[in-house]
């Protein structure tokens, strides 16, 4: 993966990859950037993958500008067409680092997913995050923090991912409170984006755990923000995994400068007002079905402690 900083580096990156006619996938809000190419798709999210692939028939690459929804959409098109993806992330979601993706309809409900995207490059520019609202800033940063935590204890963890996860956790812990208080602080935004970069790279190397499995199951059903759900689900997942991954979770806590990582994660989540699933409108009567769905996801299977649907339901009730 080629990573560059500053939107001004984008033309050079595209040329280096041999992309002369990129197809742009970005919502209307990014029109003022003046990016152009072989066409553009602005309906985000969307599950019209075949239509987008048809519109991109004359393109020699895909350029995604936006958060996880825009980048996931580009990855879905890439998996269909083989076109390389260059991402310009405007949130802290980390979607730019993994070839897997979810497909959502315009109401943000999950309608499919897969893997196999051809990822080629990333351009980070903190200026594009300066208008990100508080809830989305905190939510996507908490998603990045969950990437760090889970990379440290999933079954597929490794030494390289550990280093990146700890660095990402330290940076997010240090800078998220500042960003929450001063949304237009460019220096803090830059550091937080760097922390999310480390977190996303750790995710790509190690994978996801139970917290993400729960968040994905809930978000896919109701179209709820993935970051907000991770902010709520991560403390429960940490608590569940402590009996078998206590040392790894303690290392995560050290990166957060605390001996109570569960409490610190809750504190950071509260910066965005994220506390309980009921606050997001999740119906209590759906918890058993959500637990079943979460138990079947890859993150649950990679978790260091096996989790049955019944155990996951108990966790969901504890945060409902």
Residue ranges and their predicted role:
Residues 221-286:
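Gly/Pro-rich interdomain helix-loop hinge
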Residues 169-215, 219:
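Oxyanion-binding "anion nests"
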Residues 56-92, 214:
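A short, small-residue-rich loop immediately preceding and capping a beta-strand
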Residues 286-320:
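Short, amphipathic C-terminal "tail helix"
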Residues 1-61, 277:
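ATP/NTP phosphate-donor binding region
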Residues 8-10, 30-32, 69-76, 94-97, ...:
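Short glycine/serine/threonine-rich phosphate/pyrophosphate-binding segments
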Residues 76-160, 168, 244, 248-252:
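A glycine/threonine-rich phosphate-anchoring loop and its flanking beta-alpha core
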